[in-house]
Amino acid sequence: MAEKILVIGAHPDDVDFASAGIMSRWAKEGKEIYYLICTNGDKGGTQNNHTPAQLVEIRKAEQRAAADIVGVKEVIYLGRKDGELMPDMGLREDLVRVIRQVKPDKVFSFDPANQSFDGFHLFHPDHRAVAISVFDAIYPAAKNRLYFPQLLVGGLEPHKVEELYFYGTKEPNIWFDIS
C-alpha cells in the first residue's frame, strides 16, 4: 500500500508555497498526496475587484490546477471563511475527521511554535490557528476514540499519524532534496 501524506494549510496556495517541490517528487515516487485547505479563499489578495464568491471559485480553480501539476490525489476543503479561523474544538474536530478519513502516515502543516512577528505571512492569524489545531488534532485526538466519539458512528476509527513535519518555521531542522 502506498504511503499517504496529508499537507494542511489555511488558504489555497499555502500548501504549494510550503511543500510543492517535495510533494511533487514523492507523488512521482508513488506516494499518495492529499491537500487539506481550511478556508475557502474568499478574502485572498488585497488588490482585486472580485466579489468573495468569485474569489472562492478562482482560488479553487487555481489550487486544483496547482495540485494537478504536483500530482496530488485529492484536494479537500473545509470551506471556512478567510480570516475567521480559530483554534477551537470545531476546527479540531474537522481536522480529526479528515485525518481519520485519509489515514496519513505523514502530516505537514504550519509550525505552532512560530509565534514571533518575523513576517506577515508566518504570523497570519489563520496560519497560527491551523498550526495549533493540527498539532492538537494529531495528539491526542485523532488516535483516541474518546475524542469526538460521534465520528465513530460514521465509521471513522482512530488513526495514529507516524510523522509530523512543520513548515513556515523559524528554526528548520530538516531539508528534503527536490532536485
Language-model segments: residues:
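Metal-dependent de-N-acetylase/amidase catalytic core
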Residues: 1-6, 89-179
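Active-site rim/loop-helix segments in enzyme catalytic domains that contact anionic ligands
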Residues: 1-103
